[in-house]
Amino acid sequence: MAAVPSTISWPQRLEQLLQGQDLSASEASSLMQAWLAEELSPVQTGAFLAGLRAKGMVADELAAMASVLRGACPLPCDRPNLAMVDTCGTGGDGADTFNISTAVAFTAAALGVNVAKHGNRSASGKVGSADVLEGLGLNLKAPLASVVEAISTTGVTFLFAPAWHPALVNLAPLRRSLGVRTVFNLLGPLVNPLQPQAQVLGVARADLLDPMAGALDQLGLDRAVVVHGAGGLDEASLAGANELRMVEAGKPIATRFVSPDDLGLAAAPLEALRGGDLADNQRILENVLKGEATPAQIDVVAFNTALVLWVAGVELDLKAAARRASDTLRDGLPWQKLQDLQRALSHGNGQ
């Protein structure tokens, strides 16, 4: 749809948003800047969040807002001159799986990919990546410079989102009080402070594939995969065909459907990927990284790791990539990567 004019007031913008009109990139940027500067009242902010959710986000809006948030998050030291990958999902699939993308991060790192994992605690009953990693001994309060430097020494790091985006802290109570998912759930995966050149991003709804892929393309990534998993997962699933958007710089975004058998993996129902409470998810993640998990747990991590190897340019044949990931998992090498990161972040707190 046509964007609303840029000279109108916030109430006029809201009115046209409620009529289904998209924001222009400049208006989306202005809205995010106003939120960060606390220029809008809580009522206005809640109305805009609800209006954007009801209308549905488009790539231009997501990319513009993400660019503002990226600019509001300066690094505490120089960015390492490394090609990096992030692996994450938007959440919201309600499937209560174990922490698949977290396992993928350490598996990919064990295969030589530099992984900058951006994550948070759970916003619902599901155990978030930060929750499970903290439970396994990772220091979430490590100095930010140490977090950045860790990727150079270990090949993997974990950026705990609240430590990097303090400007969003004031919005957190309002978002919680709304009780529904908002644009910020979509922006989280787009605002990794280290700005990786490649990314695997999972979405729980098929209608988010194109907006998120378009946003990643506009943000200038070299390669990315946006995946909507069979059964509604926000990562590749073993339950059937998974719908992908393949993003490559300078090329049209491509659609691909990939099933587990395409990668030489066995199909499995979603129940085989279930997690549980924090203790359950810690145990499953440790077992996966040590190569002691169930075949389905190993296979789903291998599937998603194959996508990481593709975006990183390490292995462009997904079947071969999945085989490499499976071998690495069975050797228990990803567990060593987690231990390496634990040691790198073990000292110090705060900035």
Curated annotation (Swiss-Prot):
Binds 2 magnesium ions per monomer. Coiled coil: none annotated. Catalyzes the transfer of the phosphoribosyl group of 5-phosphorylribose-1-pyrophosphate (PRPP) to anthranilate to yield N-(5'-phosphoribosyl)-anthranilate (PRA). The keyword DNA damage does not apply. Keywords: Amino-acid biosynthesis, Aromatic amino acid biosynthesis, Glycosyltransferase, Magnesium, Metal-binding, Transferase, Tryptophan biosynthesis. Signal peptide: none annotated. Mg(2+) 1 binds at S101, E235. Pfam families: Glycos_trans_3N, Glycos_transf_3. This is Anthranilate phosphoribosyltransferase. GO terms for molecular function: anthranilate phosphoribosyltransferase activity; magnesium ion binding. InterPro entries: Anthranilate_Pribosyl_Tfrase (IPR005940), Glycosyl_Trfase_fam3 (IPR000312), Glycosyl_Trfase_fam3_N_dom (IPR017459), Glycosyl_Trfase_fam3_N_dom_sf (IPR036320), Nuc_phospho_transferase (IPR035902). Homodimer. The lineage of its organism: Bacteria, Bacillati, Cyanobacteriota, Cyanophyceae, Synechococcales. Pathway: Amino-acid biosynthesis; L-tryptophan biosynthesis; L-tryptophan from chorismate: step 2/5. Mg(2+) 2 binds at D234, E235. It catalyses: N-(5-phospho-beta-D-ribosyl)anthranilate + diphosphate = 5-phospho-alpha-D-ribose 1-diphosphate + anthranilate. The keyword Metal-binding applies. Anthranilate 2 binds at R175.
